[in-house]
Amino acid sequence: MPSNVPAAPITTAEVLPADELERILEAARTASTSLAASTSVQRDAALDAIAAALVSGADRIVAANAEDLAAGRDAGLAAGLLDRLTLDARRVASLADAVTGIRGLDDPLGLVVRGRTLPNGLLLSQVRVPFGVVGAIYEARPNVTVDIAALALKSGNAVVLRGGSAALRTNAVLVDVMRGALERVGLLAHAVQTVDAHGRAGAARLMRARGLVDVLVPRGSAELIRTVVAESTVPVIETGAGVVHVYLDASADARMSVDIAVDAKVSRPSVCNAMETLLVHRDAAPRVLVAVLDALRDRGVTVHGDAAVRAMWPDAVPATDEDWAAEYLSLDLAVRVVDSVEDAVAHIARWSTHHTESIVTSDLAVAERFLAAVDSAVVMVNASTRFTDGSEFGFGAEVGISTQKLHARGPMGVQELTSTKWIVRGSGQVRG
């Protein structure tokens, strides 16, 4: 049976000396100081160079990726993970385009968040500054290697990456390409680092590198995220798994219901913003359920339904509590009939990972109740959940979709990779 867990790290990578890992982390800290003092022109030049290097190095990147894909298939990786792992020429070009998009974003550094003049004449301003060193732990997602590095550089941060064994060869080439681009424009190559060659030891040290790494972002399976949150001494921004819901309300338009459900489930089922559970109001079910499920079945979706769903659409297989909690990352879908918007909200509150939920409705009052009651990072009305994405939100790319409430929530772009500090300008004032 295909596995949803990336293959174990390549064992030869475990023999690298621990002091080399420390040098990597310390070099990243040094590079972060240099980046914080760099200009937006310098950082944008670096991003231009990276985009160009990705294009010119596409053949090398795709060749390395082919080796990772072959190893992944031999290891029995699931289709969803293999899809995320894949970098063909088109996807490499898209990565370069994403870097160019990030380069075109406004510089977040030095932005004044708020300010005032005190009665004693002191001038206060709160301004955006880099975190310093951003760590990332992720699996089978080579696009994340480029996205996070580019966002970190744009926001003046160094980055230390742990991309997992499944993409080991691809990530090594991507990091080498980006480091070469940095050197060509006069920035420190150490601003982009990887600890992949250290295997699990690298991940463990990265999680405990408080003082050298300022913030850690995990992206991947629920198990990976739980492990990082539980074991890290570095502050973590949690990017949760995507048990994503679409709710078809009593007044849902039938055509819109089909279009949104199909897009949310089928367009790319292996990503975190894909719909995993469909909730249907009992009054809407006779109008919309069969049409929606027929359209999904015709596109290869297996429906896991409750008794009410199976009574109206016998092709469904029985759903259990495991289905309501499942992030399938495949062409599987859990479907339940509910009695009201309140029942839908209650189901979401119990089973959601607080990523993205959407309601399809023609009733503005019901839409507002749903928006107010659902506690997720992104809540939508009459739109596919697939729009929860940094590029779709205009961020160029994303570090991840934060499902926590502290610091950042939702798609994380360049501003979410900054902190703030207070600048106080005086003319000799003393408190006395």
Curated annotation (Swiss-Prot):
Keywords from the UniProt entry: Amino-acid biosynthesis, Cytoplasm, NADP, Oxidoreductase, Proline biosynthesis
Reaction catalysed by this enzyme: L-glutamate 5-semialdehyde + phosphate + NADP(+) = L-glutamyl 5-phosphate + NADPH + H(+)
Role, per record: Catalyzes the NADPH-dependent reduction of L-glutamate 5-phosphate into L-glutamate 5-semialdehyde and phosphate. The product spontaneously undergoes cyclization to form 1-pyrroline-5-carboxylate.
HAMAP family for the chain: ProA
Alphabetical list of Pfam families matching this protein: Aldedh
Protein name in the entry: Gamma-glutamyl phosphate reductase
Keyword Cytoplasm: yes
Top-level EC class: oxidoreductase
Encoding gene (name): proA
Localization per record: Cytoplasm
Pathway terms, separated by semicolons: Amino-acid biosynthesis; L-proline biosynthesis; L-glutamate 5-semialdehyde from L-glutamate: step 2/2
EC code: 1.2.1.41
